[in-house]
Design a protein with these regions (language model features):
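Conserved kinase catalytic-core segment
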Residues: 34, 40-94
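Conserved ATP-binding subdomain of kinase catalytic cores across diverse folds
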Residues: 1-35, 57-61
């Protein structure tokens, strides 16, 4: 999902997939001089909040990380998401989401309130804010174009349905 977010323009480090002991792994480039998100920095929190819809689209339940360690703030103030392993059909530790991953986008609502930190950053987003987050990254056309970066056909199909659902909701 790194490539999908990158195609949208969401900050993610360069990444490469490789196999280790028969299991897929991802190696990401170190984000030099990036610092952890500080919830007291309202400007940084607002910039992360603007990235919500792309993360909800991919089902990145762990966008912020348990200790706010999955999002860093680069020296120029832009967020970078250094671990999107909890997105798509997989949970943060690699297990399948099963029926919790599908074409519907209840994540637009439920991801605003997943403990421990999402309510502090994403909580109570208005429909207008959701629409602005979607439009910030090019809206339906850009979200659909980015699907070409997803290798698995089933994931691509589900993502297409999720994008269509989001577009209907925030139109």
């Amino acid at each position: 999902m790194n490539r999908y977010l990158d195609a949208l323009g969401v900050g993610v480090p360069d990444a490469a997939l490789f196999e280790h002991q028969g299991k897929p792994n991802m190696l990401t480039r170190f984000e030099e001089r990036a610092s952890p998100l500080d919830l007291r920095d309202r400007d940084a929190v607002q910039r992360v909040r603007q990235d919500f819809v792309p993360h909800a689209a991919i089902g990145n339940w762990d966008a912020l990380g348990l200790d706010l360690d999955n999002v860093l703030i680069r020296p120029d103030g832009t967020p970078t998401y250094v671990d999107v392993g909890g997105s798509g059909p997989f949970r943060a530790m690699g297990g399948p989401k099963g029926d919790a991953w599908g074409s519907g986008t209840s994540d637009l609502d439920t991801m605003q309130f997943k403990p421990p930190h999402t309510q502090d950053v994403f909580g109570n987003m208005s429909e207008q804010e959701l629409g602005q987050s979607f439009d910030r990254y090019g809206g339906e056309d850009a979200f659909m174009d980015a699907l070409q970066h997803l290798q698995d056909a089933s994931t691509r199909n589900i993502m297409q349905q999720r994008v269509e659902d989001i577009a209907r909701r925030v139109a």
